[in-house]
Amino acid sequence: MESLASLYKNHIATLQKRARDALARFKLDALLIHSGELFNVFLDDHPYPFKVNPQFKAWVPVTQVPNCWLLVDGVNKPKLWFYLPVDYWHNVEPLPTSFWTEDVEVIALPKADGIGSLLPAARGNIGYIGPVPERALQLGIEASNINPKGVIDYLHYYRSFKTEYELACMREAQKMAVNGHRAAEEAFRSGMSEFDINIAYLTATGHRDTDVPYSNIVALNEHAAVLHYTKLDHQAPEEMRSFLLDAGAEYNGYAADLTRTWSAKSDNDYAQLVKDVNDEQLALIATMKAGVSYVDYHIQFHQRIAKLLRKHQIITDMSEEAMVENDLTGPFMPHGIGHPLGLQVHDVAGFMQDDSGTHLAAPAKYPYLRCTRILQPGMVLTIEPGIYFIESLLAPWREGQFSKHFNWQKIEALKPFGGIRIEDNVVIHENNVENMTRDLKLA
């Protein structure tokens, strides 16, 4: 495998070209990219956990250090001012020397407010990208050049196309997440609580709760019907029926986002439904290719959901086509088939049709779909279908012309299991689709 250093060198060359093109298009001289700052809890001296600006970590794998600055002009070596205070109260990261530092000029910044004296004197044509606009104004950046929409749209659009360095980082994140999922399944099988399963996951991935790319969803039994369940009960339920784990990992700032669902018993209807959702998810991925709209795959999976609802006699006496047409599949899979993945879990530009930011919204019938792009080589996406038994979504169907088609007795029997979601992370290539998750043998 090519070394991370050589992949990073090519990655920086790609980012430099994107920067050159964006600066030329929007008539700017350079971009000043801010890692961010710590923000204190209201009426307290304790800060929220630091989350780095994703446009900053696109350039350098520095994810834990506030008050850093990057100056890029697309021509000269990117210049990184790395925050290096004298501080005996807090941990101070040393000046980095790593695989990437040959391609970036790294300069120590001893004081957070010292950046002003180090920047070029003429700043009227510098764009600022970061979370603290008032800091940019203090530095003399023109208000119109603070987070300029055109520049950000341009950079976001091309972030959809991962470099080989980015794909290498994402494959490493997959390995970490897969280790976590295996540890979590073992913890579930041994009867642990959601809280303790989460600890097992974090231990296996080497993450803290604040390091994972999103809050882990560790859902036992009916909690699996809450799409973003993050409560973490300390007590294990008296009866273990099901376990849905939606949890990822991060490597050099790049995310993995995986979901698996397990049945406590292997001989019930729910266990068979888990197997069938898994099989249909793999079958859909096998059909994926460049040049097709992501929306099409979402619609196709609703057809697959209809097939499963019919097979398991959850919906009866209705064709699969009629189920989809009348949206009887909707309450069972209320979210989209997936989303772009990268520096952010719900990565940017899912609706962007070109580098000018042209927006194509999700279909009115499926408003929660997070991507309407035509698939192209270099894109990374999640494929995460599910079937859930959510009373608030099912309740409107208990009356009306379609109520008779719902097998309410079967639905009531499945509700204590919550739901099912199976999620893999895939890379679109010219002639194939790479399933990074299954390549690591995560069943």
Curated annotation (Swiss-Prot):
UniProt: Mn(2+) 1 binding residues: D257, H339, E384, E423
Keywords of the record: Dipeptidase, Hydrolase, Manganese, Metal-binding, Metalloprotease, Protease
InterPro entries in the record: Creatin/AminoP/Spt16_N, Creatinase/aminopeptidase-like, PepQ_N, Pept_M24, Peptidase_M24B_aminopep-P_CS, X-Pro_dipept-like, X_Pro_dipept
Enzyme class (EC, first level): hydrolase
Binding site for Mn(2+) 2: D246, D257, E423
Comment on bound cofactor: Binds 2 manganese ions per subunit.
Transmembrane helix listed as a keyword: no
Swiss-Prot/TrEMBL cofactor(s): Mn(2+)
Gene Ontology CC annotations of this record: cytosol
One annotated GO molecular function: phosphoric triester hydrolase activity
Protein name: Xaa-Pro dipeptidase
Species: Escherichia fergusonii (strain ATCC 35469 / DSM 13698 / CCUG 18766 / IAM 14443 / JCM 21226 / LMG 7866 / NBRC 102419 / NCTC 12128 / CDC 0568-73)
Origin organism lineage: Bacteria, Pseudomonadati, Pseudomonadota, Gammaproteobacteria, Enterobacterales
